[in-house]
Amino acid sequence: MSSSGGGGVAEEVARLWGELPVRVVWAAVAAQWAAAAAAARAAVVVPAVRALVAVSLAMTVMILAEKLFVAAVCLAVRAFRLRPDRRYKWLPIGAAAAAASSEDDEESGLVAAAAAFPMVLVQIPMFNEREVYKLSIGAACSLDWPSDRVVIQVLDDSTDLVVKDLVEKECQKWQGKGVNIKYEVRGNRKGYKAGALKEGLKHDYVKECEYIAMFDADFQPESDFLLRTVPFLVHNSEIALVQTRWKFVNANECLLTRFQEMSLDYHFKYEQEAGSSVYSFFGFNGTAGVWRIAAIDDAGGWKDRTTVEDMDLAVRATLQGWKFVYVGDVKVKSELPSTFKAYRFQQHRWSCGPANLFKKMMVEILENKKVSFWNKIHLWYDFFFVGKIAAHTVTFIYYCFVIPVSVWLPEIEIPLWGVVYVPTVITLCKAVGTPSSFHLVILWVLFENVMSLHRIKAAVTGILEAGRVNEWVVTEKLGDANKTKPDTNGSDAVKVIDVELTTPLIPKLKKRRTRFWDKYHYSEIFVGICIILSGFYDVLYAKKGYYIFLFIQGLAFLIVGFDYIGVCPP
């Protein structure tokens, strides 16, 4: 009975279907959709990807030309020994005054030599620098310079009252030793680092100073730092800035720090050297440099309109006709961020800020009348467009999007020189900065491609002035934190101890309660999966031969996405 009933229902449905005025033919609908998709692909997708290929190849060639130019300049500098002290006048401070005094009057000669030392301000901006505050303060207070001709200024924006107390006591300790050190705080953090530096220049004692040496909290200059840098400013009135090289105390801590060392060594050894030698301009690195105060005033002082106040000041100073000199022989020890979280925040600031500054100053640069046409072209094209925009965008668009997408589109052909030869030459040009890490080049390139996702998002944010454009997160420094031994009871609590007093201060528990899903970086995971799928498609269908690159690049995205890079903070 149930079967006959079921058969009757089926017959009724068939009768009603047959009476419909328009019969739905699913195969025809599918064919229509396929035809529409093919038409859209031919009319929109393929031309768009071809345009991206052309733009990517053009930008890659621009970057190659810039790297070859930098390499040629640095080769010439080394071949002809065009050191800074051969291009500019350099004499030891006080030597001329001492020589001019009577040889019979040794005391008057020493007095004259001491008087020849200019007044120097040493600024150290800080923000909750619990692990490293003693490093820069101790190094600054140990600089070889007449004690009555230098002022150490600690600009503490800390919000942690315990840290504030520690920093103030450290300043008082050095003050008790006869060092002219000033501990300065302000009521708010307006303008972040730029605001602190600007506020620091308003004190009356600064009016007596001619030059400013700047160090971040983790930087440790050698005692002869001022003796080797200030003479360039004293004997060359056209020089506004002397920038020195960073040297990293924790470069061998993990792969993340090794990769950073490779990138920054190239930046200092080649990019800064070339800019100084040819154009007398480069981007101020924000620390380990000495400024002429008159040049800062002439450029309009510190501005907090972007997160790269150091680059902002440098560009405005060079547009006023001032020159910069890079002294690579002087190295200042510093710390690299060893956690991926800290590194991401730093790279966001370093990518977003320049793009935002370029947008604000592109017209001003072209309209400037005080610098030569070629200097304006270098500033606009080489420094900003190629160095800060193209380099941050083409890496992701080309290697992480265009090449994987081309696997799915047989109509797209990328020339071999654009896939192999040009990228190889660019990589080799950059890898020479750290010969000891040459065996890590492939891993370094893969990691840089992964970071390009973060950098392109930051650059777009800067250009559009959206979202986190003015976000300032101080780069976390671990100091010796990773060497801290766990408590005897097995807990993760860490007591903050003043190593000189050897008595605990206010104990502060640091508990890691990060939810496991907060550790992952989902955009990197998504891109990694897409690239690996493209690799499988290439193996099975496309046969373009990109699959080896796609597999290892996708794996690199997944490794970073699952946070298997850097060290775990204590």
Curated annotation (Swiss-Prot):
Classification via PANTHER family: GLUCOMANNAN 4-BETA-MANNOSYLTRANSFERASE 11-RELATED, GLUCOMANNAN 4-BETA-MANNOSYLTRANSFERASE 9
Designated gene of the protein: CSLA11
GO BP term, pick one: cell wall organization
Protein name: Probable glucomannan 4-beta-mannosyltransferase 11
Active site: D157, D310
Record SUPFAM superfamilies: Nucleotide-diphospho-sugar transferases
Transmembrane portions of the chain: 57-77, 389-409, 412-432, 522-542, 548-568
E.C. designation(s): 2.4.1.32
